[in-house]
């Protein structure tokens, strides 16, 4: 992880908070910082799962998510949403901490949205949560990529704090 990329991303986060047109640049830089990770930033999702407005992505198949949105929009239907609603704010949660590999390979939401993209690992981070809405960022890696290491998890936590301001 390069220090200059990290500091550039922090600056981009604050630029995007003033100009929404910068969010695609933020998610692209986020993906590059984490060795070409797939990034999905959702802002203002309702806790009932009624709506999950996607703010910005990098290399994430939004069409697959939208196609299966109704089926996997609630914590009952999507273990990732359940984990995000329980996780501490700004604390990255690894997919393998709430789903065994066996369960991951069988989960309908994973099979519909993540597996077709070759995604098999990820860090999910809740940015904000209140009784009606929450925001989160997910960074994923594909089968051919390594898992997230402790330095990357720490960087994700620091960056998410900037993002949640």
Language-model features and meaning:
Residues 4-151, 155-162:
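Regulatory input/activation interfaces that engage signals or partners
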């Amino acid at each position: 992880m390069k220090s200059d990329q990290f500091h550039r991303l922090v600056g981009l986060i604050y630029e995007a908070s003033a100009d929404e047109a910068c969010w695609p640049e933020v998610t692209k830089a986020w993906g590059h910082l984490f060795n070409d990770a797939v990034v999905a930033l959702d802002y203002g999702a309702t806790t009932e799962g009624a709506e999950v407005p996607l703010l910005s992505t990098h290399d994430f198949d939004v069409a697959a998510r939208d196609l299966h949105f109704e089926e996997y929009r609630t914590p009952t239907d999507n273990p990732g949403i359940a984990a995000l609603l329980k996780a501490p704010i700004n604390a990255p949660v690894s997919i393998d901490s709430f789903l065994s590999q066996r369960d991951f390979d069988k989960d309908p939401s994973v099979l519909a949205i993540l597996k077709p993209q070759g995604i098999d690992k990820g860090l999910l981070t809740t940015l904000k949560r209140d009784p009606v809405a929450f925001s989160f960022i997910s960074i994923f890696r594909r089968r051919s990529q390594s898992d997230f290491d402790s330095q990357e998890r720490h960087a994700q936590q620091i960056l998410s704090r900037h993002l949640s301001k």
